[in-house]
């Protein structure tokens, strides 16, 4: 077989034995060569064998030798190739031992490699366990922190819910107030409606916002900035909302100069029609253009009388205030012309007409005076008036305020603030009436004392006239005089004797003679005492009945609480959360406080009414005697 074939090149080991046999056969037939040539070939073969052994060791298998080089292919054709194959067979035992050793080593290495992953796996598991043990406290800490965070989050949620509820309640209150402002406003309506909805309770028929602004500006007439600077818009809108919602309190919400000026101008600007009315404003303009001053004043007076009363009153207050501003021209640098330039557009009139009205205002409104407004008393007021006249004026103010509250509540604008204000006004009215009644009683007593002192005869003169005797009477007539004096003394004793009284069999009252000045007073006191004792007995009976009712309700409550606990245990129903309990408790505490206040007010009113009934009963029973 040709060694140069591709099969020989690809698989040299398969054809090595056949080549060796062929070479051995040829070697016997060939002639002997020289020794030098043999020795050189042997050396070459030995070197090649060593190379082949080293290559076999490196490759790790002995059955197949490495690929033959081109030199080996040439040498296989030589006659001495049989010796080479025999030497290769002799060295196979050593190579086998080496191969076995290498195999043992490889097996040991493989076993060791197999054992190493198992050991390393165990070590890793131990390390993981240790890490888990180490991580357990950390995990616990993390869980505790997470729980704390959850608790904080729950608390925040509860607070947020409470804040939302409070905000909702505030929104509800503000919504109710906004409904009042939208449905019953003061700004942007006619003068009559504004006066009715925000009246001054001292009898002046102008809106309260105009009165407050004018009262404040009257104290700052000398200020140079009056009607010249603009306020902060948010502050102006805040005061507008307060007056629309009837919440303005002069003690809390204090005006300043720019706000007072702009608030007055805002009210006048937002009027739906001019202050002089749309029907008469053209005639006012015609009169203002009249050249004669005297005829101008008379015609203006006639036109003013045709205005509605509330429009005329408001115009009078505004013009008199502007006149007071002009009178301080030396300080505020404002005269009639400059003030008319500033405010005539606000009043919806021409500059000429406003100047004419300012010139004649003192004559046109001679009966009007700018009086500072004193609001009605409130619960925070220090004390009640001390004189009957002041009490009567305050009663008129409180009655006016009460009628205004009733009209607003009848229109459907009912809020808790309105209810509290209603009870407060009623309480103040009862206190004022009680104090006025005490003054009236004192006046009646003083009048009775004056009448009794004027109608009583002088006692000394009667005694002198009875005891006087003639100077020249004889001594024999002494017995007659004594006998005549005895009946006189008998007739005087019934008048002066303190025990001269009678007892009424039906009532048991002590009755003095009709001529006695203390008869009526004593009888009045006895009747009043009798009425008060009846009231006391009635109250005692009611107290006993109330105590019995309380005892009955306590027993009923205990039975119902036991039944409800048993029912809840049987059903196993869960109680509502604490937030709901807190909300319910807050709601009912507020309601109870309001009801307690109402109860106290009603109790005081009932007491006053009962006292008035007793006084009337006393007067009726006095008529029987």
Swiss-Prot record:
Compositional bias per record (Basic and acidic residues), positions renumbered to this chain: 1-11, 20-60, 94-157
One Pfam family from the record: RLIP76_Ral-bd
Alphabetically ordered keywords of this record: Developmental protein, GTPase activation, Phosphoprotein, Repeat
Domain Rho-GAP intervals: 191-385
Recorded GO CC terms: membrane
Sites marked Arginine finger: 228
InterPro entries cross-referenced by the UniProt entry: RALBP1, RalBP1-like_Ral-bd, Rho_GTPase_activation_prot, RhoGAP_dom
Signal sequence extent: none
Any one GO MF annotation of this record: GTPase activator activity
Residue numbers of Phosphoserine PTMs: 68-69
BP GO annotations: receptor-mediated endocytosis; regulation of Ras protein signal transduction; small GTPase-mediated signal transduction
Record carries keyword Cell cycle: no
UniProt feature, compositional bias: Polar residues: 475-484
Gene3D superfamilies in alphabetical order: 1.20.58.90, Rho GTPase activation protein
Self-association state and partner proteins as the record states: Interacts with CycB and numb.
Function noted in UniProt: Participates in receptor endocytosis during interphase, is also involved in mitotic processes when endocytosis is switched off.
Protein's name according to its UniProt entry: RalA-binding protein 1
Species of provenance: Drosophila melanogaster (Fruit fly)
Taxonomic lineage from the root: Eukaryota, Metazoa, Ecdysozoa, Arthropoda, Hexapoda
């Amino acid at each position: 077989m040709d060694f140069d074939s591709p099969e020989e090149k690809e698989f040299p080991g398969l054809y090595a034995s056949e080549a060796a046999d062929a070479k051995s056969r040829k070697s016997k037939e060939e002639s002997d060569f020289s020794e030098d040539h043999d020795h050189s070939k042997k050396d070459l073969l030995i070197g090649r064998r060593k190379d082949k052994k080293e290559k076999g060791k490196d490759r790790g298998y002995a059955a197949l030798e490495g690929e033959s080089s081109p030199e080996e292919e040439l040498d296989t054709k030589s006659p001495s190739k049989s010796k080479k194959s025999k030497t290769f067979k002799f060295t196979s035992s050593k190579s086998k031992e080496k191969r076995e050793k290498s195999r043992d080593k490889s097996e040991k290495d493989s076993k060791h490699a197999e054992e190493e992953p198992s050991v390393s796996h165990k070590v890793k598991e131990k390390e993981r366990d240790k890490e888990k043990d180490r991580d357990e406290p950390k995990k616990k800490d993390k869980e505790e922190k997470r729980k704390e965070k959850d608790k904080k989050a729950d608390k925040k949620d509860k607070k947020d819910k409470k804040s939302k509820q409070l905000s909702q309640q505030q929104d509800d209150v503000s919504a109710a107030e906004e409904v009042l402002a939208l449905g019953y406003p003061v700004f942007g309506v006619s003068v009559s409606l504004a006066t009715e909805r925000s009246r001054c309770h001292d009898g002046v028929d102008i809106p309260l916002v105009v009165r407050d602004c004018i009262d404040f500006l009257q104290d700052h007439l000398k200020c140079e900035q009056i009607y010249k600077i603009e306020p902060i818009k948010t502050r102006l809108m805040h005061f507008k909302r307060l007056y629309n919602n009837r919440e303005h309190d002069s003690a809390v919400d204090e005006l300043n100069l720019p706000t007072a000026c702009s608030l007055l101008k805002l009210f006048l600007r937002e009027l739906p029609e001019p202050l002089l009315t749309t029907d008469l404003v053209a005639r006012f303009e015609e009169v203002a253009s009249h050249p004669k001053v005297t005829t101008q004043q008379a015609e203006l007076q006639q036109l003013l009388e045709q205005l509605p009363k509330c429009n005329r009153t408001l115009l009078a207050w505004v013009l008199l205030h502007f006149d007071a501003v002009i009178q301080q021209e030396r300080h505020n640098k404002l005269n009639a012309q400059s003030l008319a330039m500033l405010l005539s557009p606000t009043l919806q009139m021409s500059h000429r007409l406003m100047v004419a009205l300012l010139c004649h205002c003192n004559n046109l409104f001679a009966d009007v005076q700018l009086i500072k407004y004193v609001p009605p008393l409130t619960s925070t007021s220090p004390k009640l008036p001390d004189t009957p006249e002041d009490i009567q004026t305050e009663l008129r103010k409180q009655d006016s305020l009460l009628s205004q509250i009733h009209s607003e509540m009848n229109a459907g604008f009912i809020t808790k603030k309105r209810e509290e204000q209603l009870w407060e006004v009623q309480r103040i009215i009862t206190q004022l009436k009680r104090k006025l009644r005490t003054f009236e009683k004192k006046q009646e007593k003083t009048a009775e004392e004056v009448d009794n002192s004027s109608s009583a005869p002088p006692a000394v003169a009667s005694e002198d006239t009875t005891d006087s005797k003639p100077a020249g009477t004889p001594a024999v007539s002494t017995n007659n005089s004594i006998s005549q004096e005895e009946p006189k003394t008998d007739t005087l004793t019934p008048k002066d004797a303190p025990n001269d009284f009678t007892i009424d069999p039906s009532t048991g009252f002590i009755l003095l003679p009709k001529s006695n000045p203390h008869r009526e007073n004593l009888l009045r006191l006895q009747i009043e005492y009798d009425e008060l004792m009846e009231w006391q007995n009635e109250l005692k009976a009611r107290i006993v009945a109330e105590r019995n009712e309380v005892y009955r309700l306590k027993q009923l409550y205990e039975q119902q609480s036991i039944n409800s606990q048993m029912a809840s245990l049987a059903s196993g129903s869960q109680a509502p959360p604490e937030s709901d309990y807190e909300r319910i408790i807050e709601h009912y505490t507020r309601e109870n406080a309001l009801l307690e206040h109402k109860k106290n007010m009603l109790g005081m009113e009932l007491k006053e009414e009962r006292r008035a009934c007793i006084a009337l009963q006393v007067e009726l029973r006095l008529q029987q005697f």
